[in-house]
């Protein structure tokens, strides 16, 4: 239950003075919530130094300044478009305040001749004179009026001013009880020189002095609070999971050894470690929640197959869920080849299965005849039931939302779940989004995989690239050619235009696959390429993950400067899956930005997906490394990633 001392902060926004029925919905829209607590979490984006200058001599153009002077004159405009001009004098010179379309009588009342005024605003220089247009603050020092020494500047929305938001935040801070017990360890507070929670809130929303170091410490303290709150949430989730009941699936070493004996290669040490982790988890009486992270081509499906065998040998069912029809059927093919010869009943279920085939699959799942099934979202639709689902494996898990995974889990009695990702995630990001999961990492590639040589080439040399691709086709190799868009009248790098050009130049059948095609058309194009009916496949990024064609040795990516590092790495991972030397050509259009050059240089330098993920995280932040379904999970309000990653590390200890 929530501590009653927190109740004032969870009042509606109209509990604050000055927030009425008109302002309340506008403020709610701005802060993304309905409570005073939501308002306090709406952080300023910067802070303006409004400390007073000693004289007009200290003014600098284009800076915000606060000055004090005597009203020397108020000059009416000489035409409708000219401003009213107010002259202030401080003994060292003049400052002209300009007001366009202002009420003259109001200005006369605000600026009586001979009286002192304090004004604050942006300084400009015009014809050798200092000017300030429409000052932000006009104060009468004789009444004790002074602008704030530092003004927080907030992100705003239509209908709100910065002054109104600032005033609301200051009022909200008064509801924070200074007597709250401190939840941060005293030694950490002292080591980091962090203020108390209330002092930190004051430090960002209502600082008394302009001190960048103090403001930064206040922000750090609040950011750490957010990291700590998330870590505590994960900790509670882990505890709750361990208190939940699940079917304990005993380890099946003999069955796994039989599967290993059929393989034409030895599993990597990383695969063995991950399998041991999963075997131990499955043998527990509470549900497994584990993520298997692996670089492209690291052999995640084999590890998933080991888990499926353990479930099947225990008398349970296992479901593999993939995000697309192509991946689901490819996964089925792999599982069928691995497990059917050993006597396991493997099937597939996607939205495209109809009629008697679908009915037979549904019946097999319901009566338990099917032990292992691969499929898409169709697996968790109404009408699909399992006799004894105890293991759920979600491939390319970043393509699914939490709700999708929970729907599939609901088909069983608290089944164990393994989520697999071919997109390496930096450690900090994994802690932020998947802190409730145990993590296993595949950081080795199976023996026999060839390194992929990556070359960065200007698109002015595209003819040379086409010639090289032609020579590869003559050697019975295959090539991917990735384009950034489907079609465009003025862009020859579109998939449609490039496919036509390659057909003409190479005199070869060229496949084409893109997101606008129907599912059956995409499947047919991919199948033709996989079986060698076409030797070159022009595609958009729909082939980014999961497509496995060992004969493909060349990946050409046009306009590569427009792709993210992680996406380029995934595309490159479509080649280098066989025994022949493979190449990735990153075609770019000059001039390159510094960030684009750094991305391409990173790809050229390394094939390590985890190193690439860290670089992408530093270059572009967390959003591009996660699918839309998950990016909200790392949407910190106070923490800035990757700059404050260290706070997450501290909170997780």
Regions found by a protein language model. Give the residues of each.
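Extended, structured, electrostatic nucleic-acid-contact surfaces
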Residues: 1-17, 25-26
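Conserved pre-motif I regulatory segment
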Residues: 25-26, 31, 244-292
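Upstream accessory/linker segments immediately N-terminal to the RecA-like ATPase cores of bacterial MutS
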Residues: 77-262
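Short boundary/loop segments of OB/S1/cold-shock single-stranded nucleic-acid-binding domains
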Residues: 45-65
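Inter-lobe coupling/hinge segments of SF2-like helicase ATPases
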Residues: 273, 286-601
